[in-house]
Amino acid sequence: MPSHKTFRIKKKLAKKMRQNRPIPYWIRMRTDNTIRYNAKRRHWRRTKLGF
């Protein structure tokens, strides 16, 4: 990835960065909750974004 990024790419990277975080702890504490972790977590070295 070049150091000079276009604004479009930068926006996409920012969105993926926001998506790539664990779920908040209070969501796990809710009643009848089945979500234990973020299944769509991405590791920067294992899985690439493809753009």
From Swiss-Prot:
Pfam families per UniProt: Ribosomal_L39
Example GO molecular function: structural constituent of ribosome
GO BP: translation
UniProt xrefs under SUPFAM superfamilies: Ribosomal protein L39e
InterPro entries found in the cross-reference section: Ribosomal_eL39, Ribosomal_eL39_CS, Ribosomal_eL39_dom_sf
Keyword set includes Ribosomal protein: yes
Annotated Gene Ontology cellular component terms: ribonucleoprotein complex; ribosome
Swiss-Prot/TrEMBL keywords: Ribonucleoprotein, Ribosomal protein
Keyword Ribonucleoprotein recorded: yes
Family under the similarity heading: Belongs to the eukaryotic ribosomal protein eL39 family.
PANTHER family: LARGE RIBOSOMAL SUBUNIT PROTEIN EL39, RIBOSOMAL PROTEIN L39E
Name used for this protein in its record: Large ribosomal subunit protein eL39z
Organism, scientific name: Oryza sativa subsp. japonica (Rice)
